[in-house]
Amino acid sequence: MPFFYQQNINETAHLAIWSIQEPASFFETDVQLAVPIANEERRIQHLAVRLLFKLMMPAADLNQMVMADNGKPYLIGLPFHFSFSHCKGYAACAVDDKPIGIDIEIIHPRIAKVAHKFLNDSEKAMIA
């Protein structure tokens, strides 16, 4: 499994990013989707982020995962929070004991030109 990046943000918050290079069959031996996804790229992204979550939180039962009204997944009765994101060959997962969010995006040259309008100095340093 090609981890691209992993970080312990603090004592309770953790994140991991995976560079997806495997076919769907690699993931389907360990995780399944509750709802079928026809688009192959999206299906692989959804499978990858769930396997990444399972590796980060091995005690979690993915069969207990449901979607909130806002589309955010959660696990029934568990005292921790998590967030998923995926984009163009990457899957990301963040976990904490309080609400947490993660979003990954591909940096396009035209967006980079206007990044100064919406990123703070530390965020700009991360993408430099």
What does each of the following model-derived ranges do?
Residues 1-128:
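Core catalytic alpha/beta fold that binds nucleotide/phospho-ligands
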